[in-house]
Amino acid sequence: MVRAARRKRASEDDLSRGCRAGQDCPIDIKNKYEQNTLADRILKWVSSFLYFGTLGISSGKGTGGATGYTPIGGGGVRGGKGANVVRPTVLVDALGPTGVPIDPVTPDEALVPLLESSGGSTTLDVPPGGEIEVIAEVHPPPAAGDPEITIGHPEEPPILEVIPETHPTTRVRTTVSKHDNPAFTAYVASAQLPGETSASDNVFILHGFNGEYVGPAQTGEDTVFEEIELENFGVPESPPSSSTPNTSFRNILNKFQRRLYNRRLVQQVKITDRTFLTKPSKLVSWEFDNPTYTDDSLSLIFQQDVDEVSAAPMAEFQDIVTLSRPVVYEREGLVRVSRLGQRGTIRTRSGLRIGGHVHYYTDISPIRPVEDIEMRTLGEVSGDSVIMQPLAESTFVDSGDVLNEGNIEFPDSTLEDDYNEDFSRARLEITTSARSRTSIVTVQEGIPPGSVKLFINDAETIVTPHGPESNDTDRYQPFIPVTPAATPDIIITFEEGTATFFLHPSLLKRHKHKHWFF
């Protein structure tokens, strides 16, 4: 048995073209190209209440729509670019549009009527709204052969008239500047008086010193010049309302204050802790900073992780990311210090932190109004003088009265001295003739083994004790020279260049000598 040969079926595109031409069409090809397959019918039924967008669920290509399929968790895939179109290197003439209709026109004679004229100028009379008549002069054509040129008589030389070319004139603008030095140039001005020719000129010499007028320029009835009162230009009529001028920095500060006190966008928080003025970073996070490298006058940036929740030292500074530099200004009669902070409560996948703005402020001290400040008078404006006494009240003395000896009288008892001199803490000063130096020795009572006795290494030195004065002449002690008669208990030796003393050998403490026997 011979098996029949299996022939290959034509492609789907060829079969579809045959179907459109009227050939027999397989049912599957017809349903596919007419979008009548089972999948197409299901999609049409379900699309009445569901929308699949551009997923491309049909019998077409599985390309995923216009943008293609996008994998989950990844970005889109760009399609490949088409082939580059090679442009020709030669110039291509642009062709006009085809099918432009051409309207036929009735042929007329292309003849211009010419009128003969006896010469002269040609006049064109154009009637309004009528045709233009052109009048031209017609000359006979030249005869055949070489033309004959005749220039005057043969004996005369030819004359050629040359007309020079005219060039357009160029505009030239010239400016002159003159600068005079008033130190070396004299300004001369004549008196402009009608009918006067004998008036002398006035010369003004302008230099660094005061000038002198030469000529009839005296004040009075014979004044030549007109005196014009000088006016000041550019001077404000009223002084500024405040001592602080309105500068650009003031405008920036006002704009910054309006931004801080916007309650719809910025949260207002008042801080009473004084650490906010010196170390605001301690209120945000628990950290130890080196004061050598920390400057609180700048903006502060805090590195915090949103995933790791940590409590701030102060609840008002929770989740603060940045703190601006401090701003000091006046607000409602108080000196206020403000800082603008931003929270970082939310973090996106891209790493961006989102949070609201917080305005932290604290008041330092009130500002007293100008009326409450007591002003002092500079200088004396009246005839009264004020004498200030620290131990008594102030006394007003009329300076108009002349003070003399007759007006001031004091009793003799005012000049008496009621104080008794006490020399219980007196010091004994001894002056030697070696270098004229004064040595001060403090005499203390009760030094064992007796009173202090002085040993002076100068025989000419005289010690003069002074006691309280008394009217009793018997108790008066004359000058007595001091000479050591016996060895004193304590010897004080004054040597040159030293201020120490040495004890007598008899007063030194004795040491026990231990004998060692071997």
UniProtKB/Swiss-Prot annotation:
Motif (Nuclear localization signal) positions are: 1-10, 509-514
Instruction: Report the record's Gene Ontology biological process terms.
Output: microtubule-dependent intracellular transport of viral material towards nucleus; symbiont entry into host cell; viral penetration into host nucleus
Q: Organism's domain of life? A: Viruses
Q: Which GO terms describe its molecular function?
A: DNA binding; structural molecule activity
Which Gene Ontology terms of cellular component type are present?
host cell; host cell endosome; host cell Golgi apparatus; host cell nucleus; viral capsid
Give the free-text PTM comment from the record: Highly phosphorylated.
What keywords are assigned to this protein? Capsid protein, Cytoplasmic inwards viral transport, Disulfide bond, DNA-binding, Host endosome, Host Golgi apparatus, Host nucleus, Host-virus interaction, Late protein, Microtubular inwards viral transport, Phosphoprotein, Viral penetration into host nucleus, Virion, Virus entry into host cell
Localization per Swiss-Prot or TrEMBL: Virion; Host nucleus; Host early endosome; Host Golgi apparatus
Question: Matching InterPro entries, A to Z?
Answer: Late_L2
Disulfide cross-links: C19-C25
The protein's matches in Pfam families, at most eight in alphabetical order, are given as: Late_protein_L2 (PF00513)
Describe the family membership recorded for this protein in Swiss-Prot or TrEMBL: Belongs to the papillomaviridae L2 protein family.
Reported function: Minor protein of the capsid that localizes along the inner surface of the virion, within the central cavities beneath the L1 pentamers. Plays a role in capsid stabilization through interaction with the major capsid protein L1. Once the virion enters the host cell, L2 escorts the genomic DNA into the nucleus by promoting escape from the endosomal compartments and traffic through the host Golgi network.
**Tell me, how does this one assemble?**
Interacts with major capsid protein L1. Interacts with E2; this interaction inhibits E2 transcriptional activity but not the DNA replication function E2. Interacts with host GADD45GIP1. Interacts with host HSPA8; this interaction is required for L2 nuclear translocation. Interacts with host importins KPNB2 and KPNB3. Forms a complex with importin alpha2-beta1 heterodimers via interaction with the importin alpha2 adapter. Interacts with host DYNLT1; this interaction is essential for virus intracellular transport during entry.
Name under which the protein is recorded: Minor capsid protein L2
